[in-house]
């Protein structure tokens, strides 16, 4: 990303370049088969912009049809064709680039194309996760066709070892096509045809029209004021970002700094705030196109009501609250700031492990398995439905102080991400830690 900045690229250009490289070098956490969320601070307008780059389910498959495919299963699997949703990352790249980019997309992707052709050393932690992925997929080879993944990452029957030079010429060709032909090559052109043909062969209900219809959504980040002028900003559902804001609105009602960090008292309030917020996550967070989000979840009044339920002496059993519908918004995270002050907070993931194990013919990447998070209960806000985005765990964040940009924030960890965001914020605001200390202690 530093080379991209030195060449005159913006923070968004550098973020795209870095994300592409991570998809090659850390395929166990992210890649162009997954989804992307981002928050951008634009120094020209002095505003935050949010992007929801998550994909949808097949338009022609109903919940009843899905349940018929699942048989006696009570939830969606993590592997195979059924948990696949449209990959949103590539479209999100172009949305970000069209608004904030300076270099061409081909220039942004060129370093990763080169690394994919010439090879790169495999990091120890990636070697470990690749080995785990091989074991997980091998156990399920009677359930779905794992052969394309074997060709890309496990050609000799084993996972690459730490220090091995790994090459992925198929991914190089795919990225080169995207850079040369643009977004439509992936969602409407030959790449889309390859993906849909492969998915249908595996038993998926996706069509060419589903891919052509995909689009990212620009959204307004919402912010909650903590104390001392600090604001935490997150993206709205179908992500879980609002859970962090709910925790902030609960915790602002108690002075955590009166106790030492990590003390039983402080940890009790942190834990109870998380539990209260997560009850609402399970009840209210879903694709707002299907289930409107009660914006009252973010009101200070609602935060006070939830805080009042906490017993300072013991853990308490909670249920979801009753917010008003109208109010009084495995993973790799990266952040880039350029010389003009543009700041990018970007998170991207294939969801569980490398994804669902399916690799389209000759394209060098794996489809995500995010659809595992759909509920099969038709009454649930996150119930599976045609053309619906599933609940998302990945959330970028942004922190302002006295209205000015202060820092970007994000981390891996699935469902604990809102909790992690709040822990970092509390460590900085209440316990005076610097950024490194706050992250290490969280």
Predicted region positions:
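Noncatalytic scaffold domains of N-terminal-nucleophile
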Residues: 3-7, 11-181, 186-188, 193-239, ...
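Short, small/polar residue-rich loop motifs at catalytic or cofactor-binding pockets
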Residues: 218, 328-331, 392-394
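Extended C-terminal regions of large enzymes
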Residues: 234-237, 399-416
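Internal maturation/activation junctions in enzymes
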Residues: 253-350, 363, 370
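Compact, glycine/acidic-enriched structural inserts
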Residues: 308-311, 428-442
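Active-site rim segments in enzyme catalytic domains, especially the processed small/beta chain
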Residues: 24-28, 35-52, 67, 205-207, ...
């Amino acid at each position: 990303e530093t080379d991209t900045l030195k060449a005159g690229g913006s923070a968004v250009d550098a973020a795209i370049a870095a994300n592409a490289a991570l998809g090659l070098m850390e395929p166990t956490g992210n890649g162009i088969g997954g989804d992307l969320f981002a928050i951008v601070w634009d120094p020209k307008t002095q505003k935050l912009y949010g992007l929801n780059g998550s994909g949808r389910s097949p338009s022609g498959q109903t919940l009843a049809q899905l349940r018929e495919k699942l048989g006696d299963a009570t939830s969606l699997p993590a592997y195979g064709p059924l948990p696949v949703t449209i990959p949103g990352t590539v479209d999100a790249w172009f949305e970000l680039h069209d608004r904030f980019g300076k270099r061409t997309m081909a220039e942004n992707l060129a370093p990763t194309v080169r690394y994919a052709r010439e090879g790169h050393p495999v990091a120890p932690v990636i070697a470990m996760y690749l080995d785990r992925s091989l074991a997980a997929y091998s156990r399920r080879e009677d359930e779905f066709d794992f052969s394309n993944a074997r060709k890309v990452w496990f050609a000799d029957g084993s996972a690459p070892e730490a220090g091995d030079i790994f090459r992925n010429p198929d991914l190089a060709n795919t990225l080169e096509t995207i850079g040369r032909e643009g977004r439509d090559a992936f969602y409407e052109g030959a790449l889309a045809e390859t993906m849909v043909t492969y998915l249908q062969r595996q038993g998926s209900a996706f069509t060419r029209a589903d891919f052509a219809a995909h689009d990212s959504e620009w959204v307004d980040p919402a912010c909650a004021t903590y104390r001392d002028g600090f604001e935490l900003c997150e993206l709205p559902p179908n992500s879980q970002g609002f859970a962090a804001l709910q925790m902030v609105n609960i915790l602002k009602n108690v002075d955590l700094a009166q106790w030492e960090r990590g003390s039983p008292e402080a940890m009790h309030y942190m834990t109870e705030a998380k539990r209260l917020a997560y009850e609402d996550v399970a009840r209210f967070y879903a694709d707002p196109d299907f289930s409107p989000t009660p914006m009252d979840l973010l009101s200070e009044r609602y935060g006070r009501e939830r805080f009042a339920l906490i017993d300072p002496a013991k853990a308490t059993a909670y249920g979801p609250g009753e917010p008003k519908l109208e109010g009084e918004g495995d993973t790799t995270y990266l952040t880039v700031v350029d010389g003009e002050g543009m700041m990018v907070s970007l998170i991207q993931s294939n969801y569980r492990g490398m994804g669902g194990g399916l690799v389209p013919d000759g394209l060098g990447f794996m489809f995500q398995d995010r659809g595992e998070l759909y509920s099969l209960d038709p009454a649930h806000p996150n119930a599976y439905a045609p053309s619906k985005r599933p609940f998302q765990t990945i959330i970028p964040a942004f922190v302002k102080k006295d209205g000015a940009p202060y820092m970007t924030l994000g981390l891996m960890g699935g469902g604990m991400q809102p909790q992690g965001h709040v822990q970092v914020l509390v460590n900085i605001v209440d316990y005076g830690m610097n950024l490194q200390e706050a992250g290490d202690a969280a």
